[in-house]
């Protein structure tokens, strides 16, 4: 069992709230201290792991206790960055106009499989956030790629991961599928 400096209750919250609360709480920690996050959202494991990696914090792991996931993150040192290099964004409205008029868009949906199966934009590539680092090579790093999730948080983390891997034209769709009114499958 890991020891934490601070415990954060994010039980019952859906994406992006566990990340939002974690980001705020990390500011209260000193470098090297550990934050324990209690969550019930199954997607929180991949979300927190990717967020920690993209901001210079250390993801230590997750312990499950029934429905509760106990995530552990160690605050990074002076080189950690909450907002490392900006990622270009497109509004959902502007993105929908592109989808409606252009059949050749490259769209990556990084939501969990359950979310994707409920409804997704026709023709998207689906790679859950937790698999983006390993599977990004399935995409062409020189293509313009629009990345979408539920709210814009996970897609931003995926874009950061892909940018570090050499992708040059990744664009985060904000706010994401929660407000999507276009065609779905």
Swiss-Prot record:
Pfam families per the UniProt record, alphabetical: Rhodanese, TusA
Domain of life: Bacteria
Gene3D superfamilies (UniProt xref): Rhodanese-like domain (3.40.250.10), TusA-like domain (3.30.110.40)
Catalytic machinery residues: 15 (cysteine persulfide intermediate)
TM region positions: none
Residue ranges occupied by any Rhodanese domain in the UniProt entry: 101-185
Family matches, as InterPro entries: Rhodanese-like_dom, Rhodanese-like_dom_sf, TusA-like, TusA-like_sf
Similarity comment: Belongs to the sulfur carrier protein TusA family.
Protein name: Putative sulfur carrier protein YrkF
Organism from which the protein derives: Bacillus subtilis (strain 168)
């Amino acid at each position: 069992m890991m020891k934490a400096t601070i415990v954060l209750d994010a039980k019952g919250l859906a994406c992006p709230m566990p990340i939002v609360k974690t980001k705020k709480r990390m500011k209260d920690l000193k470098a090297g201290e550990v934050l324990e996050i209690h969550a019930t959202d199954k997607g929180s494991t991949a979300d927190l792991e990717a967020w920690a990696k993209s901001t210079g914090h250390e993801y230590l792991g997750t312990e499950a206790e029934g429905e509760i996931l106990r995530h552990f993150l160690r605050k990074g040192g002076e080189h950690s960055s909450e907002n490392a290099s900006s990622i270009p964004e497109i509004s959902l409205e502007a993105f929908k106009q592109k989808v409606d008029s252009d059949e050749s868009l490259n769209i990556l949906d990084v939501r969990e499989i359950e979310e994707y199966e409920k409804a997704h934009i026709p023709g998207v590539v689906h790679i859950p956030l937790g698999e983006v680092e390993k599977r990004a090579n399935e995409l062409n790093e020189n293509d313009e790629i629009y990345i979408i999730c539920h709210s814009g948080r996970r897609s931003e983390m995926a874009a950061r991961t892909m940018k570090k891997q050499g992708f040059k034209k990744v664009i985060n769709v904000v706010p994401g599928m929660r407000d999507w009114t276009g065609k779905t499958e």
